[in-house]
Amino acid sequence: MKLQLVATCLFGLEHLLGEEIEALGYERISTIDGRVTFSGDCEAVALSNIFLRYAERVFIKLGSFRAESFEELFEGTRALPWPDFIGKDDIFPVKGHAIKSKLHSVPDCQAIIKKAVVRAMSARYGIETFPEVGTKYQIEFFILNDEATLMIDTSGTALHKRGYRKDALGAPIRETLAAAIAATSRPRDNVLLWDPMCGSGTIAIEAAMLMRRIAPGRSRHFAAEEFSFIGKKLWDSAREEAFDTEIDSPFEAFASDIDGDAVKLAEKNVRLAGVEKNVKVFLADARKIAAEGRRGTIVTNPPYGERLGTVKEAEALYREIGEHFRSLSPWQVYVITSHPSFERFYGKKADKVRKLYNGMLPCYLYQYFKK
């Protein structure tokens, strides 16, 4: 079955996501803010959910059409091939978003789409009411500038939830963003990666998973595993490929923190992620870490706002780590923070700055390549 698939991501990660979709062997059709559309098949549903490191969800796209009125929304939805995917006993709830469009009431759009899907299903199955007791097919709509896109969610739980982080401290960085930051820092087998304010250890864990080629979704469940048109064999084959892809690596990462509770949590998460051979977790003050003659890269998400008492405390910390990290040169430094004036307090203008998002929170990745 030929499919159009949509992988969503945090704003700023579209390029990385597109590259890994192509690395899986699938053709990229289009890229807009927060989503990449690509062509695939049922196998692609399994492989993309299991392997994509930067995606938040993977959807099957049923179609797009102009919808400036409820009538257009109803007719456009009804014309799509819903019965090719959803059985007469299955559950099909509707949710979505409407942005910059004439149809701005989400509850009204939900009701119209639900009614249209029922009408399409009735035409195929010859019944007027549906028990909705079977497999769940979550329908998602996205209306932007009066263009409606209708999709079915194949992921279920968001893909950033790998399964290794059961608990977190404060406002943790999302796993997909941590993976992207780790990749941007260009980790290498012979260069130590150090997160000296590791919190729950996510950046170091994602870096180790990247270097070990551990597929992020290989040990979790997805909504589409219950879809009758895909089948268990495809999922079993995709998981087998995921485990076969893993390699040994001498890559080494340090995950340290001044907070003992954070260290305990990071140790637990490292074990659950299966990267304890690559990630060493210990108690340390970021303002006192030593290079000890090694080549290294600092990649960190320093506490700010919710993760620290006050903004002034955070700014004082930025000054102190700025002075200390520069003494570690020629180490490169990558800092992700939502503080809008980080460079001023850190004491040095970054060589490169990338705007990213941790969920809906705008952040900046400050990259320091040289002294």
What are these regions (language model features)?
Residues 285-288, 292-371:
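C-terminal catalytic and target-recognition region of SAM-dependent MTase-like enzymes
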Residues 173-290, 306-307, 311-313:
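Conserved S-adenosyl-L-methionine
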Residues 2-135:
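Non-catalytic nucleic-acid substrate-recognition regions in nucleic-acid-modifying enzymes
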Residues 21, 94, 141, 266, ...:
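Residue-level signal for inorganic ion chemistry
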Residues 97, 142-184:
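Class I S-adenosyl-L-methionine
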Residues 9, 257, 337:
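Short beta-strand/turn micro-motifs composed of small residues
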Residues 99-102, 158, 303-307:
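A short, flexible beta-alpha/helix-coil linker loop
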